[in-house]
């Protein structure tokens, strides 16, 4: 009883193995056939590696800062264009639409240090500090388009009073001469011709000098006198209230005013006559006052 099932199992397993082997062989054969067909098709097409395409991800992400990267990209783009047979438009250079030009190699840090700047030639420093002016076109050099020259503002002319050309110089009087002239002026402000001649000879001065000094001294005395009179007028002005507030009252004082007001209000006589109440004075004066705020002189 035990041998039969075993035989059946063995047969089943053998059959399964044979069936599975046949299916695997068939699938491998189909894959080989597809591979050969794909290889034939790929062989018929031109082979272009993805790294040679100028717009591939590898080409765009490539590090162009490395030496020779730009040349490799240009060569790859030219190879791709030759393989594809595509025509470039006019005015477009091969590889011009690729990645931007690689920056120049960075200078060493010591080039921008203080020592490096000091070691630079003077010509380079002068050229860097004062760049040349751009050339002007002919129409800009024409005087028609050039701005007018700036006008220099001259200083304003002096507006002081000009003296006469034939003016005589000022006489430098000595202290003794000034004292004698002041003493003589206090005695007499106007001198006669004889007195002036005698006095000028005693002071070693000319008659014209003495005459002019007396004229100036009289004008000065007049100014001083006018200023003194103005001060006296200001000091003599009384500090009185205006005439509008100086109300006049009849003689008799405020009591008479109150009595007159009561008589006119309640009558001259009567059984119900009240005693007059004291009234405060309305004005400042109890008699007729004719003073005003300013005195006329």
Swiss-Prot record:
GO cellular component, one term: nuclear periphery
DNA-binding region extent: 166-225
GO BP terms, alphabetized: embryonic morphogenesis; inner ear development; negative regulation of gene expression; negative regulation of odontoblast differentiation; nose development; positive regulation of cell cycle; positive regulation of odontogenesis; regulation of odontogenesis
Record-linked Gene3D superfamilies: Homeodomain-like (1.10.10.60)
UniProt-listed CDD domains: homeodomain
Composition-biased stretches (Low complexity): 25-38, 77-88
Disordered: annotated segments: 13-50, 77-107, 129-169
Keywords on record: Developmental protein, DNA-binding, Homeobox, Isopeptide bond, Nucleus, Repressor, Transcription, Transcription regulation, Ubl conjugation
Basic residues composition bias: residue spans: 160-169
Covalent cross-link Glycyl lysine isopeptide (Lys-Gly) (interchain with G-Cter in SUMO), where: 9, 127
Compartments reported by the entry: Nucleus
GO MF annotation: an example: transcription cis-regulatory region binding
Record PTM: Sumoylated by PIAS1, desumoylated by SENP1. Sumoylation of Lys-9 and Lys-127 not required for interaction with H1-5, transcriptional repression, inhibition of myoblast differentiation, or binding to gene promoters.
PROSITE patterns found in the cross-reference section: HOMEOBOX_1, HOMEOBOX_2
Binding partners and assembly: Interacts with CREBBP/CBP, TBP and SP1; interaction with these transcription activators may inhibit autoinactivation. Interacts (via C-terminus) with PIAS1 (via N-terminus); the interaction is required for the localization of both proteins to the nuclear periphery and specific binding of MSX1 to the core enhancer region in target gene promoters. Interacts with H1-5.
Record's function text: Acts as a transcriptional repressor. Capable of transcription autoinactivation. Binds to the consensus sequence 5'-C/GTAAT-3' in downstream activin regulatory elements (DARE) in the gene promoter, thereby repressing the transcription of CGA/alpha-GSU and GNRHR. Represses transcription of myoblast differentiation factors. Binds to core enhancer regions in target gene promoters of myoblast differentiation factors with binding specificity facilitated by interaction with PIAS1.
Family of this protein: Belongs to the Msh homeobox family.
Protein name: Homeobox protein MSX-1
